[in-house]
């Protein structure tokens, strides 16, 4: 009977998803790939953010809080650049560090990636959105790098 109970306890613990932090988010910014691969991720849920970077001999993980102004800035940049309507190109690229941005909150909800480039007409808008996330990462993780 003890083995039976222990089995169900282990089964219950195994079924708890440790990746929940990474699947339930409002905003996601990630960069990955390249000849010398890197993996960089930023997940934002509410006012909490989780950042990780692996590559180039570094391994950084950091959790931090965001202010309401920082969240409003992200949403404003997404709206000003009409993030949802940015068009991805369909070229095939290899050994390229690509950036992916996923927005699950608000009217600009969409998933975009420059893995096969962004259409020329939308490059400036894409760069504005990516720059906003990049600046946020740089300001919050300067001490961790």
What role is predicted for each listed range?
Residues 1-23:
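Bacterial Sec-dependent N-terminal signal peptides
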Residues 16-55, 61, 65:
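N-terminal export/targeting and maturation segments
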Residues 17-34, 85-145:
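Short, well-ordered, aromatic-rich surface patches in folded extracellular/luminal domains
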Residues 47, 66-69, 114-121:
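A short, sequence-level motif marking secondary-structure junctions
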Residues 54-56, 76, 115:
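Surface loops and adjacent helix of pleckstrin homology
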Residues 61-87:
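Mature extracytoplasmic domains of secretory-pathway proteins
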